[in-house]
């Protein structure tokens, strides 16, 4: 009887140890899955997060001017739309009193390693603000439209969302390309062009990417 009791206790201990090991293994696996889930950069998510950060940390009077994307691969190569970096550009007016103020330009740079905030004292004068614009075309949708059209793809990894200052009042554009060649995707209608709609077609100016 004593031997049977010892045998039963030994079996219970073995089962208990195995149960603990299974629980421990499950806890170790969970963080790995979580960490993989946050490695993909989603452009629209960074915009929302940065808007909230600017509003909470730097004041309500801000202007969202640009969102830049750096692709992992070249547009005219094997690019599948994967993203290496996203940069969101804001300008904030800091009122000192009723007659004076300072302005700062904030850039939020997102990579898989994290987010870096940079600021300079000055103005952003290259674009119209995007705050009140109805941007309905996502980055992913714009990329797919560029890949589907029969235009030569620029040798570039750069994309920017902006509403350019020009003689023609045009919608915000997703601009894919470099300083010598661009493809424009209307961020409201989705129309794809190989010329800048903010300028007459016969007086085109190439956009110089500034980041």
Regions found by a protein language model. Give the residues of each.
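Bacterial lipoprotein signal-peptidase II cleavage site
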Residues: 21-28
